[in-house]
Every structure is written in C-alpha cells, then in structure tokens.
Amino acid sequence: MFLQNAWYAVAWCDEVTDGIVTRKVLGRELALFRDGEGQPRAILNRCPHRFAPLSLGKRIGDAIQCPYHGLHFGPDGRCVHNPHGDGVVPDVATPTFPARERHKLIWAWMGDPALATDDIAGGEYGYLDDVELDLLPRGHLHLDCDYRLVIDNLMDPAHVAVLHDSALASEALIRAVPRVWREEDVIRVESWAPDSKPSFLFGAWLGNHDDPVDHWVASRWQAAGLLSVEGGVVAVGGDREDGLRVRGAHMITPETETSAHYFWAVVRNFREDDAEQSEQIRATTAAIFTGEDKWMLEAIERSMDGEEFWSLRPAILGTDRAAVMVRRALESEIKAEGRPKVVAVSAG
C-alpha cells in the first residue's frame, strides 16, 4: 500500500551531478539527472521503444541517449532525436515525475503532477538548510522490510530502552508515559523524564554521566514517510530551549512492498562547526541504524513471512499508541486517494 500523491526523498543533492542515478520508488525505477540549468529531473528508467534502461545510456546535452537504439529523450520525457533512417522523431515519451531540490535532498512526486505541492512537509526540514553539507552527518540506508515497519520504529520511543540500550537508553525514559497528539496532518509523540541520569550518548556530549538532567525525546510524522525525532537534555527545571539538543530528519521512501530507502541527517546545537564531532555523530548514528534498527526490522519482515500486519493480530501496548495512529492515518489517506472523486452537478 503506497500513497502516490506525496513527496518522497530519492537522493542527496550531491548524488545527482553530471551522470544518471537510478532509484526504485513505489515499485517504479526512476532515472535521476540534472538538466542544462542544473535542475533535478526524474523520468521512468525505461525506453518506450524496446524497454532498455535509459540509465545505461549517455547524457547528450539536456537529453539521455538510449543505449540500445540511440533515441534521445529530453527532460520532459519526450523523444527528441531518432538517428535512424529518415530521422523522423516518433511521438513517444517515457513518463516523468515532478522533482524538486529542497533541504539538501532531491524529491520526487509519484502521483498526479497537477497535485504536486510547492512545499515539502510544511517546511519542517528547514533546519537542514542551516548546516553546511560537508558538516551535516547524514546517510542513505537500504532496508529489506516494509517501509511502515521503519515508521513504526521511529514513532515508538519504548524500543530505545532495549534495542539501543548501550547508547540511547535512559531508565527514566523507559518509565515515562508518552504523550501522543495530532495537529491536522501531523502526529506527534513525546516522552519526558525529569530529574534523571542522561543516556550514555548525552552524558558523553555533556561530559557528565552522573548529574541528573531533564531528558526528553519527541517524534513527528507527516505523510507519507516524513519524520523528525528530537532528543535533548537540560539542567533540572531548566528551559528546554537552553538544553543540549540533537534533531534527526528521517525520510522513509518505499522501494517495493518489502523494501525501503532510509535517508537520514542529524543536526545539533553544540559544536556545530566541529568537523570531528560531525564525523563522530555520523559514524555512531550509522552504526546504530545499521547494526541495530536495520538488523531488527529486517528480522521482523522475515518473521512476518509475507503476512499482512493486522492479520497477525499484534498485541498493542500503551506505548504503541503513536505508531498505531500513524498506521491508521496512512491507511486512511491511501484509501481516500483511491476513491473516485464525486463531482457535484447542479439541477438544470
């Protein structure tokens, strides 16, 4: 089940330069490239003549030359040159998808182009714009699991205490009762642990593992797979804005029904210009996501063995409320998208 009319992250901006990048999104393989003005373009990676992957071809000016028979396709997907015979250009095109460059990422809109919005996630990822690209801890992870399992994971503060016990766990956060609420099309969950010891990573960043702090973790979801997760600590009784904070952007893009792309980046409000600190955060985050989250989510996918999530009748804990709300909201949006539109006709 995929939401078509939504923006999906498909590449980091510096991945798409002079060549052609391929990425499968919602079961369709895209060819990503930049036109002569440097704007990102996304077309179906399939020549409409004999179905050769266009990504195996060459860039010639604004066009891509098919590697099989040499037809040229422009940024709008239309054939613009036929090298054979009388040179008559066939009236054919490969499908195109709206593409944007925002917040250091390339995004593609997989649904109706007329419905593509100008903004992405309501500008939520604007905090990525304030960090130089070479100082931004970031990555792209491929997972062999349903994309909704990844979203469940990010909206579930309870798993941190067990799966990430060595780096992120906090005894007080384990006992905290998450607050869950909805603001229009955004669902949020937050856990608050006052007067408690920091997790290992926050203790390391503070340089103090023993003194109590007020600790929090908060997640935000917006369709289809756009999430932010913030963790922070502040002196007991202090203002959260004065605390030490780390904020993660998590963009989940379905590849197929059982695989996904996970784009992530982390910003912080301490030692922001320290390249060594950035690399330490990148390496630590990548190790956690790869060695713990990816490992677990792919194991869950295998364990489910192709069964539909709700058909397995999962036990629901109190800490699952946010993840369940998101699943229901996403299911509702997908169903609404598939319904025929009702057009009112006035009586004549």
From Swiss-Prot:
Record-listed substrate binding positions: 250
Cofactor binding: number and manner: Binds 1 [2Fe-2S] cluster per subunit.
Pfam families (UniProt xref): Rieske, VanA_C
Activity sensitivity to pH: Optimum pH is 7.
The gene coding this protein: cndA
Molecular function GO terms recorded: 2 iron, 2 sulfur cluster binding; metal ion binding; oxidoreductase activity
Top-rank taxon, per record: Bacteria
Assigned EC number: 1.14.15.23
Activity regulation summary: Activity enhanced by Fe(2+) and Mg(2+) ions. Divalent cations such as Ca(2+), Cr(2+), Co(2+), and Mn(2+) show moderate inhibition of the enzyme, whereas heavy metal ions such as Ag(+), Cu(2+), Pb(2+), Hg(2+), Ni(2+) and Zn(2+) severely inhibit the activity.
Residues under site feature: Plays a role in the stabilization the metal coordination: 153
Keyword Oxidoreductase assigned: yes
Function (record text): Component of the chloroacetanilide N-alkylformylase multicomponent enzyme system involved in the degradation of chloroacetanilide herbicides (N-alkoxyalkyl-N-chloroacetyl-substituted aniline derivatives). In vitro, catalyzes the N-dealkylation of butachlor, alachlor and acetochlor to yield 2-chloro-N-(2,6-diethylphenyl)acetamide (CDEPA) (for alachlor and butachlor) and 2-chloro-N-(2-methyl-6-ethylphenyl)acetamide (CMEPA) (for acetochlor).
Leading EC class: oxidoreductase
Lineage: Bacteria, Pseudomonadati, Pseudomonadota, Alphaproteobacteria, Sphingomonadales
Iron-sulfur in keyword set: yes
Binding annotation for Fe cation: 159, 164, 293
Keywords: 2Fe-2S, Aromatic hydrocarbons catabolism, Iron, Iron-sulfur, Metal-binding, Oxidoreductase, Plasmid
Subunit structure: The chloroacetanilide N-alkylformylase multicomponent enzyme system is composed of an oxygenase component (CndA) and an electron transfer component formed by a ferredoxin reductase (CndC1) and a ferredoxin (CndB1). In vitro, chloroacetanilide N-alkylformylase assays in which CndB1 is substituted for CndB2 demonstrate that the two enzymes possess nearly identical activities.
Cofactor requirement: [2Fe-2S] cluster
Catalyzed reactions: butachlor + 2 reduced [2Fe-2S]-[ferredoxin] + O2 + 2 H(+) = butyl formate + N-(2,6-diethylphenyl)-2-chloroacetamide + 2 oxidized [2Fe-2S]-[ferredoxin] + H2O; alachlor + 2 reduced [2Fe-2S]-[ferredoxin] + O2 + 2 H(+) = methyl formate + N-(2,6-diethylphenyl)-2-chloroacetamide + 2 oxidized [2Fe-2S]-[ferredoxin] + H2O; acetochlor + 2 reduced [2Fe-2S]-[ferredoxin] + O2 + 2 H(+) = N-(2-ethyl-6-methylphenyl)-2-chloroacetamide + ethyl formate + 2 oxidized [2Fe-2S]-[ferredoxin] + H2O
Binding locations of [2Fe-2S] cluster: 47, 49, 66, 69
Signal peptide stretch: none
Temperature notes for this entry: Optimum temperature is 35 degrees Celsius.
Protein name: Chloroacetanilide N-alkylformylase, oxygenase component
GO biological process, one term: catabolic process
Species annotation: Rhizorhabdus wittichii (strain DC-6 / KACC 16600) (Sphingomonas wittichii)
Domain Rieske residues, every copy: 7-108
